[in-house]
Swiss-Prot record:
Keywords: Chloroplast, DNA-directed RNA polymerase, Metal-binding, Nucleotidyltransferase, Plastid, Transcription, Transferase, Zinc. The keyword DNA repair does not apply. GO terms for cellular component: chloroplast; DNA-directed RNA polymerase complex; mitochondrion. DNA-dependent RNA polymerase catalyzes the transcription of DNA into RNA using the four ribonucleoside triphosphates as substrates. This is DNA-directed RNA polymerase subunit beta''. Its EC number is 2.7.7.6. In plastids the minimal PEP RNA polymerase catalytic core is composed of four subunits: alpha, beta, beta', and beta''. When a (nuclear-encoded) sigma factor is associated with the core the holoenzyme is formed, which can initiate transcription. InterPro entries: DNA-dir_RpoC2_beta_pp, RNA_pol_beta''_euk, RNA_pol_Rpb1_3_sf, RNA_pol_Rpb1_4, RNA_pol_Rpb1_5, Rpb1_funnel_sf.
Amino acid sequence: MEVLMAERADLVFHNKVIDGTAMKRLISRLIDHFGIAYTSHILDQVKTLGFQQATATSISLGIDDLLTTPSKRWLVQDAEQQSLILEKHHHYGNVHAVEKLRQSIEIWYATSEYLRQEMNLNFKMTDPSNPVHIMSYSGARGNASQVHQLVGMRGLMSDPQGQMIDLPIQSNLREGLSLTEYTISCYGARKGVVDTAVRTSDAGYLTRRLVEVVQHIVVRRTDCGSTRGISVSFRKGMTERIFIQTLIGRVLANDVYLGLRCIATRNQDIGIGLVNRFMTSRAQPIYIRTPFTCRSASWICRLCYGRSPTHGDLVELGEAVGIIAGQSIGEPGTQLTLRTFHTGGVFTGGTAEHVRAPSNGKIKFNEDLVHPTRTRHGHPAFLCYVDLYVTIESQDIIHSVNIPPKSFLLVQNDQYVESEQVIAEIRAGTSTFHFKERVRKHIYSDSEGEMHWSTGVYHAPEYTHGNVHFLPKTSHLWILSGGPCKSSLVPFSLHKDQDQMNVQSLSVQERSISDFSVNNNRVKHKLFGSDPLARKGRRISDYAAGSERVISNGDGDFIYPAILRENSYLLAKRRRNRFIIPFQYDPEWEKELTPHSSTSITVEIPANGILRRNSILAYFDDPRYRRSSSGITKYGIIEVDSIVKKEGLVEYRRPKESRPKYQMKVDRFFVIPEEVHILPGSSSIMVRNNSIIGVDTRITFNTRSQIGGLVRIEKKKKIELKIFSGGIHFPGETDKISRHIGILIPPGARKKMDKGSKGKNWEGNNWVYVQRITPIKKKYFVSVRPVVTYEIADGINLVTLFPGDMLQEKDNLRLQVVNYILYGDGKPIRGISHTSIQLVRTCLVLNWDQDKKGSIEKVQASSAEVRANDLIRYFIRIDLVKSPILYTGKRNDRSGSVIPDTGSYCANTNLFSSKVKIKSLSQHQGTVRTFLNRNKEGQSLIVFSSSNCSRINVSKYHNVTKESIKEKEDTPIPILNLLGPLGTVPKIHNFSPSYHSITHNEILLNKYLILDNKNPKQTFQLLKYYLVDENGRISNANPCSDIIFNLFGSCFLPHDYCEGTSTTRIISLGQFICENVCLSKHGTRIKSGQVIMVYLDSFIIRSAKPYLATRGATVHGDYGEIFYEGDTLVTFIYEKSRSGDITHGLPKVEQVLEVRSIDSISMNLEKRVEGWNEHITGILGIPWGFLIGAELTIAQSRVSLVNKIQKVYRSQGVQIHNKHIEIIVRQITSKVLVSEDGMSNVFSPGELIGLLRAERAGRALEEAICYRAVLLGITRASLNTQSFISEASFQETARVLAKAALRGRIDWLKGLKENVVLGGMIPVGTGFKRFVHRSREYNNIPLEIQKKNFFGGEMRDILFHHRELFCSCIPKPKSFHNTSEQPFYAMGSNPIVHKSGFIIS
C-alpha cells in the first residue's frame, strides 16, 4: 500500500468510460495482482463512489428523452423502394420465395443496423448527456439494441419456429405500433410472457440433466499421470481473446521450447505472463492437459482440471467440479431466456466480402473460366472456378483485379463500371463453424387453378406412383387460373373443353343424390332463364358467349335455385330427319314473369340418348305455380255441382312411375292452405282437438303454430295435426250449406248465405272453402277457410318458344306444349321446410310424323355445338333412327358410344355418370375445360372466368403467312392456322382427310390433316383433357389410351417456318408469357398467362401465376392437377445460418448435447464416427484398430462439440470456460458400444462400457473385444452410469430398479446424488477425506483375502460392474495407474493432426 502511495505521482490518469467488460478485466487483474481480500476492499470503495455520484446526478428518464433519429424516414423509404422492386421481380417469376425472403430480410436488417449507428451519432451530436444514451452505454439499463427499439425501429421479428417474418416493424416503441405490427411483435418469439415461462423451464430442465450426467465427478487425485494433451496453436482467424481464454488456468502437458531453450515445463499452470510469452514467441503448438486427457473414468485429477475459476490457483481436492460445470452451462440459459429482446437472427450465409472496382472503366475477363449461375438473392452472376484476373480499362490506365475461386462475378464482360462499384462477391469461408441448418420452406398457391410445368424439364417422381417430383434444374411452375366446380363427379354432357359459359354466382347446398338410374333413366339439364332486373345496364364482354347449365336429376323432388343467366333461348330448327334446338332466350318472357321470378327450362335427355314417341323432351316450371306451404288441391267449382271431368293421363310409364301427371282442360284450380304437423305417436300435444288457437301457440314442447285457426288431430301410426286458418260458423237449421261436407263458394254466391251468421270471414271478394265438421253426434259447425286461386294461362305456346324458321323443309318432327298439374284433385300437398313445391309443369312433348315405309319408334338425341361470330351456340340434335340401335361397349360403360347403322355418327351421347354431387359454382363467366379425375369415375370441370382472361390486340397479320408452303408436290401442307380456338378432337370413324370447322372469324378454314403414308388408318382419340406446353406439345392425360395425338404437329404450321415474315414475335397457341414482356410495337403491358386463343389481330391470354423453383425443390402434385388456394405447390430446402440468439441457441445446445439434432451437426459426427471405425480397424488390425479408432473418433467429436456449444454462448456474449463444457462432453463421449462381431465372454453385445474399461479388459484378456465409439445424449448418459440409485432418481425409476435387481447390480455410492438419496455423507469437500482414507485402506488388503471376501459374499454379478473390483481380480499386483503411464498408441507419441486445427497427441 505504501509503495502504491509513493508511486502515485507516476501513475497514469485514464479518462475513460468503463463498461461491463472493462470492469471484468480490471477486477481479474486486481485479483491476479493483489489477491481476493484486497480486491474486494478496492471494489467496495468503487461501489460507494458510484452510488454517491449517481445520487448527485439523479438521472431520470422521461418520454421526451426518447428522440427519434431524423434520418429514419428516408432510410425506411429507401428500404421500402427496394422491397417493392423485389416484390415485382417475385411477381414476374424472376425470383423465388426463398431468395425474396433472404433479400428482404437483408434489406431490412441493413436498414435497422444503419439506423442504430445513426442513433448513436445523433445522440452524440445533439444531446450527449441524454439519459437514454448514457444508460445504454453504462450497462445500467438495457443495451444499444434495446434502445434502438425504443427510438429507432423494432426491425425484424422471428416467428415461434425461429423463422424470420419478412415484414419488419418499422415503428419504434416511442411512436407506437400499428395493429399489424403489434401482432407481429407478439408473434416475435419470446415476446410473450408465456414464451419466457416455457423457455425458463426448458433451461431449468437442461441444467438438471447436465448436473445429472456429471454429478459424480469430483477432484480425487493430484495427478493421474496422463502424458497426452490437446494442442492449441495461434491459428489464423482465432482472436487473441479466445486464445488467452483457452490457455489461462490450464496445465501444460509437455515442456515448451523456444528454440533450444525451455520456457515452460510439464505440469506447470499457465498464467497471464506465460500466455503473453507464448503469443509473442508464436512457438510451436502448445500441449495442454484437459479433462479429456485425464486417465480416470469416474473422477478427475487436479492437473487435468487446472485452476479453479474462483480462486485463481489449482483446484482443491474434493471439489465437486462436475456440478459446477453443469450449472455453469445451464445457468446462462436461464438468465438469457429472460432477455426478451432480439434484433433478428439474419439469414446471412456468413457475411460476404465484396470486391469493388478501383476506378471507372470497361471491365474485361476470360468468359471461358466462368459459368452463369444465380446468387443467393436470385441475381444473375458468374461463378469462377479458378483465380480470375479481371482488367478494368479506364482512359489512360489498366487496373487488374484478382478474384479468388468460388466467387461470384456480378458484372458482365465489356460492361462499364464506376469506381467503388461492387463487381464481385467473395463467398464467406466455409471453414467457419456456422450453425447452418437445412430449412424447408413451403410455397403455397395464391389462387386456384391448374398446375403446369415449363418445357424441357423432365420430372420423374421419386416413387413410381408418387406425385412428388424433384426439379433437375431451375424452371417455372405455372398455376393457370380457373377452378373446378367443387365436386367430385359432375357429369356435364354439354360442356366441351374450351366452351365458354356464363356463371353468375350460385350457391347450391350440397346434396348427395342417390344413383338415379334405378328409378329414372333420365338426367335433366336445367337451362336457366335470367333475372330481367339483373340484365339492365350490364355489358357482356365481346367474347363471352353465354350459355350455362347446371344438372339436376331425380324426379324433380329437388328444386334448386335457378341460375340467372344472360342468354338462354330455346329455338327450334327443323331439318330433314333432324331437329335442332338451340338453347337461347326469348326476351318476350320477361314481360310475362313477375320481376323476382326465375325461369328455368329443363331439357330431359335420357342417359342413352334415345327418345321414344310422345316422350317429354323439356319442361318448364312456371314460378307462378309454386308453393312453399302445405295445402290441398281442388279443381273446378263444387258448389255448382259441375265437377270437371279430369282425365288421368299417365305419361311415359316407367317401371317405377313416381307420380302421374294430370293433363287439364280447366282454366283455374285452387289450393286450400293448411298447416300440417306430423308428430310421433308418443309426443304430448298441448292443444285440444277442435279448439281454436292463435298464431305462435305452442303445440308441442318444441313446435309452435305459424297460423291461427281450428285444430284438427287425427291419430294413426303418427299423429297428424292440422291447423285450418279461417273462421267458424254455427249454422241454423235452414242453412243450405249444412248438406255439403266440403264445397268451394265463389265470391258471388256469398249473398245467398245465411245473414245471421256471425264472423267477418264471409266478406271479401275471394273464394272460400266451406267444410262441415261434426265433433260429436248431431252437433256440428262449419269451418270457413280461405282459398288460393291459380289461373292457368294459355301458357307458353310454340310460337313464343320457337321463332318461325324460314327453312322448313319437312315438318316431320313436332313439339306439343302440354300443361300438367302434378297433384290430383283433393290430393294433399306436403311442403318440406325451405323448399318450394311446383304445382303446374309445362312440358314439351315430342312427336313425329309416321313414315310411309314403317313406323319409327325411337329417335336419337345428342347435343351439338356451333361457333360463329364469337358466339358459341348449343343445340340439341335429334336424329330419326330407322334401324335398331347398335350398342358398342358395355351397358354401363361411360365411353360406350351409340353408332347407328346409317353411318351418321352422333358424338358424345353418354357423358353422364350416375353419382352426382352438386355444389356451388361461384365464379363469373368463364371457359370450361374438362379433365379426368384421378378416380376415373367421371369428369370434372374447371371454370376460368373472363376476369381471369385478358384480350390483347397486337398489330395485324403478324402471325399469319399468306401462302402455303409446299415441301413435296403431293403432300398438302396446312395453311398457318392460329385462328381457331382449341376444341376437342372428336372420334372420327370414317376418316376424311379434311374437315370444316366454324371458327370465330366467320370464315371456313380447311385444316388439312396430314397422314403418314405408312399408317393411313390413323385413329383419333377423344382427349379427355389436354394441356398445351410452351412448344406446342400436347400431353394426353388419359392413361388408358395409348394413342398420342399430336394436334399441333398436324394442324398448325410450326412457327419456325415464319422466318422472314415479320420482326415481331410469333405468338403460338399455348405459349406462356410472363408479365411485362413487350409483344408489339406499341408495347402493351400484359399480365402473365398462357395464350389460349389467337385471332388475326388479337389473342386471348388465360391469366396464370408463375412460380420460380430452383433445382432440387420438391414439386407436389402432378402436371395438370388442380390446386386450390392455399395448397402446397413447392417445397424448397435451403440452408440458412441459425439466428444467433440464445433462446434459439438453447434448443441448439440441447440438440448438440442430446445428439439427436435434426440438423446436420451431429449427423455428420455420427457418420464420421462410423467411417473412422471401419477404416482404422482395417489398417491396424483388430485390438489396436478398435482402440485407436474409438480414441480418434472420440477425440474428434469432442473437439467439435465443444466448439459448437461455445459458439452459441459466445454469440450472446456469454463467456463460459471451456473446462466446464469439456467435462460434460467427456461424459457423453466416454462410452463405447460392444459390437457383435467379437464373441467375448466378459461383455454382452450391445452393452455400453467406458472406453478405459474396454481398453483394460482387452489388454487383460487374450481375445480382443470388438467395440465402437458412440455419442450418447445427456439423458442416455445419465441413465448409463455406474450407480443405479442415481439413474432411478432421474427417470424411469421402475425400469431402472427392476433391471438392477435382475442383474444383481451393486451401487458403490461414489457419486453425490446416491449419497444424498440415502442420507449418507457426500464424498466431496470435508467428506472427501474419509472417502479417500477408506479406499486407500481397501487397496492395501492382500489380494487373496479380497478374493475370499468377494466370492464369499452373495455376489452374483458375473459382469464385474465395478472397475476397481474388476482390476483387483486380475492377478497383477501392480496398480493400474502405473501400467497406464506408458503410451498405448501404436504409433508412439506422434501427434495425430485433425482437420479443425487441433492436434491430438
